[in-house]
Amino acid sequence: MVVVFISILLLLGFTGCTTTSGEIQDWPWQDPEVEQPEAPEDIVEDATLDRWTDVSADYGTLPEYIKVYKSPDKLEGQKAVAYIAVADMNSAQWDIWSINDSEMSGTKDSFKTPSTVYSEGLWPIVVNAGFFYSSGGLNYSSSLAVRASEVLAYNINYASEDWVTIYYPTRAAFLESEDGGFNACWTYYKSGGKHYMYPAPADNTWEAKPAKTPSSAYPEGAEVFAAKTAIGGGPLLIDDGKIRNTFVEELFNGASGIGPDSCHPRTAVGVTADDKMIVFVCEGRQMTEGVAGLTTADVANVLLDLGCVEAINLDGGGSSCMLVNGKTTIKVSDGSQRAVASTIMIK
């Protein structure tokens, strides 16, 4: 994983918890009395994939509603090796595997490689997800994880560069609500079981004093958090069809270690307006000669071009890995798969 801020857990007065349509073609009538069949919808509109190559057949049998594409040789003007899995969520299902760190005090639950997660469930698509760390013999998730409406981990709710001045950032989450709608938002967990979601991030920056601690009143528009399935990460890349890339407000620059303005392997998840989920991974760190990776701004632009209206960045670097029917896509930068705290699975 890209190193997330902390190697120690601060026990302060609060509870420390961790941290994004296919258009139907009009057919001519041969006979006004005989209805002609509609053309099948593409998983993503052709215009958005005109430079991507459908490589689904390279990975064995996939459900007809899941496709896998390889990127062109360049993305955002840089040499690239990237893959996307695109799933029509009107037919597909997604889920989260995560360690259970719901008490935010660390766990003995083991991290798992994506291959281990695949072997346990044989999901056609498995991709790494949230941030994490280990300390004092315990494993911690720094990112929200919700499975079957149960919170297994929360987005980390504090950050510091010197462990004297403490900030309380909101962090990105990608979720499916109980009614089946998808959304990207910012979240914050407070002690006492108070968990909120926001339409905008807390206005933090390392260059200023900490913003107010998030609450039911700040940032504006707070709602009690609720989701059927959710994964955290950051920064939030796209909201309501607009690029946000809020790494400054989420305090992902500086000491966070994810290097949002530098080229690295990346993982991200998003959804299009017509409920096509897109999981994205790109290679980096010269695993293929000349391929350094992408910035978070690059990833946001790519996902917007692919039609995403909501999207977030996930853990990248050595954690970035996507399996299709158990087969690797990108070359992972650690040389072998890293054991992680959470994954996204699609079938």
Model-derived regions, located:
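Active-site-adjacent helix-turn-beta-strand microarchitecture at beta-sheet edges
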Residues: 135-260
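Conserved, well-ordered active-site substructure
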Residues: 136-164, 244-310, 319-347
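Short glycine-rich loop/turn motifs
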Residues: 80-84, 171, 232-234, 263-268, ...
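C-terminal motif of bacterial Sec signal peptides marking the signal peptidase cleavage site
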Residues: 13-16
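Zymogen propeptides
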Residues: 18-191
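Structural recognition of the beta-strand scaffold that forms the well-ordered cores
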Residues: 124-128, 174-175, 236-237, 270, ...
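Bacterial N-terminal signal peptides that target proteins for export
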Residues: 1-4
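C-terminal regions of proteins
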Residues: 47-50, 54, 58-76, 310-320, ...
